[in-house]
Amino acid sequence: MEHTHQYSWIIPFIPLPVPILLGVGLLLFPTVTKNLRRMWTFLSIFLLSIVMIFSLYLSIQQIFLSYIHQNVWSWAINNEFSFEFGYFIDPLTSIMSILITTVGILVLIYSDNNMSHDQGYLRFFAYMGFFNTSMLGLVTSSNLIQVYFFWELVGMCSYLLIGFWFTRPIPANACQKAFVTNRVGDFGLLLGILGLYWITGSFEFQDLFEIVNNLILNNRVNLLFLTLCAFLLFVGPIAKSAQFPLHVWLPDAMEGPTPISALIHAATMVAAGIFLVARLLPLFIVIPSIMYIISLIGIITVLLGATLALAQKDIKRGLAYSTMSQLGYMMLALGMGSYRSALFHLITHAYSKALLFLGSGSIIHSMEAIVGYSPDKSQNMILMGGLTKHVPITKTAFLVGTLSLCGIPPLACFWSKDEILNDSLLFSPIFAIIAYSTAGLTAFYMFRIYLLTFEGHLNTYFLNYSGKKSSSFYSISLWGKEEEQKLNRNFGLVPLLTMNNTKRVSFFGKKTYKISNNVTNQTFITVENFGLNTRTFYYPHESDNTILFPMLVLLLFTLFVGTIGIPFNQEGIDFDILSKLFTPSINLLHKNSQNFVDWYEFLQNVTFSVSIALFGIFIAYCLYKPFYSSLLNLTLLNSFKKWNSKRIGWEKLINFVYNWSYNRGYIDAFFKTSLTENIRRLAKQTNFFDKQIIDGITNGLGITSFFVGEVTKYIGGSRISSYLFLYLSYVLIFLRILFYF
């Protein structure tokens, strides 16, 4: 056992040869390196698989032998200061390593096909290999200096991957936005590290926790300064894990390739912030005010992310805001002191969200064959619809991921989210109300994404898209907003069934279009003609096996990974592997908990949360299920007429929510107005002052000296008469000055 741990330090460096060799090869032997592109893919997957097996072995050992292993080497800089570096292996490290490697391997397999058409294929795999190395180095670090080093490498890799298509202005701006936003968090993290070192004199986690505890117990530390340092440490995870108010970079990060969106949102960059808070929880837990701040930031992010996801039309941006909300749940759990629940949700969410992003990538890949390689079209859910019969495997995988994120049993996220919701009841009634309400919103917006994408009929070829519905048959907009047109009070099923089948009614316009005499009529949503050839209809097709295989593996994870934390221990049933792994575990809300509940208590706890999720799904189904395929919508439409007295207030509320969501809560606009524009204005003024004033003075003195020299040289000219003239001039000037003064 000890012999095995002696080689744990090599975990971060196993994937490193691939990016190094790719970089050298592309510089020195570009043709040969590009011809061997599949070899580099296989090598990347093979090396990451070795890390996964090693991490899995360590986790199995830790389940049966609860231990923490640390190995540190010291580098003496002088007699007063020495830098220690090493590796730290505990259950958190093992779990994170497994998470990073499993998701990373599947994303690499997926990327082999998804990125095959891209000229930067090898550059992408080099970045991915370095990204995995940086994240593995972060989770195995034994001290804050190593954490900060790999923390910066993770940020650099995300910058490179978000801006992978840097020749396009939008991705270039997105990666700069992510980089600058994370610099704010990184600066706070650095200040916090330096402040803690000033207090404790150590960077090592174990020493740090012990020294801080002793200082607080003996009242030998300034609590205000310690709280400030702890908060500065927390600023880093706020930015990295896209917590309010430093979340603004996350939706723009969707401008990168879809595989990297899956990796960032599942197991790397955003998970890094949650990991660091979990690692430093023994420090935060002795400072109650910091724990409350963590939970407050978490609950704000939970609600904000959910509300911002409501009106998104880009499928990846909708999933990005979903990630933001779920990260808020994890941060809330950590702030409440529910260590196990937070990490459990980190695990289940990682696999579910990776499945959803890879599923969205498969959808986008299929849509690109029709609308072209334009994110504004291929990622727009308005142009989708009716994909069930075209991409059935992708649809099934996406549905499972959606149900999991909604918290529907027995899928993965149900088990972890329900624990967090139950803990919120014990922590604060207000926080519990927000957390439970957001669970309903999550179910609503996730099923909205699913229904807009897969139900109905393909909307790509339809004309005159205006974003509004004026048909008297359909009064719900694409995000669920009721329009102002009046409905026929006596509208029923018979007129619908007797409509002319050779015509179709636009959901957005009153004009009708004849489809074909040979094609069965179907009711469509009309959308703008983007210059496509509408005479020949092409339909999306299912993706290749190398894209589907990772999705199916993630589907299995989504189905079964929740079993590792099922809190049942009755009649010989003992599923709770996670509690064994995290023994002893920090839990401020269940200090005397036995880490299991019986069936009756479990059913009591989950009934309410599942009911809220089902209600959210029901509302989404009512508003987004295609009109012609659901009799329920007829009842809904006829009921709108009865709401005339309340429609004005209802529409104002709907418009407010829509504008809030569509404009990203006005937070981006606030930052742009108060920070970005002012900084740019200051930069322009500074540039003007530097060039016109500072450089003007310097250049002016130089030019003046030059002309004075030239004039002097001309006047002198090696002629005696000129010298006499200058001499007499100086004498006269001197006498004049002397006479007056």
UniProtKB/Swiss-Prot annotation:
Q: Which GO terms describe its molecular function?
A: NADH dehydrogenase (ubiquinone) activity; quinone binding
* Entry EC no(s): 7.1.1.-
Q: What is this protein called?
A: NAD(P)H-quinone oxidoreductase subunit 5, chloroplastic
What domain of life does the UniProt record list for this protein's source? Eukaryota
Starting at the broadest rank, the lineage of the source organism is: Eukaryota, Viridiplantae, Streptophyta, Embryophyta, Tracheophyta
Q: Into which family does the record put it?
A: Belongs to the complex I subunit 5 family.
> What is the catalytic activity of this protein?
a plastoquinone + NADH + (n+1) H(+)(in) = a plastoquinol + NAD(+) + n H(+)(out); a plastoquinone + NADPH + (n+1) H(+)(in) = a plastoquinol + NADP(+) + n H(+)(out)
Give a short account of what the protein does: NDH shuttles electrons from NAD(P)H:plastoquinone, via FMN and iron-sulfur (Fe-S) centers, to quinones in the photosynthetic chain and possibly in a chloroplast respiratory chain. The immediate electron acceptor for the enzyme in this species is believed to be plastoquinone. Couples the redox reaction to proton translocation, and thus conserves the redox energy in a proton gradient.
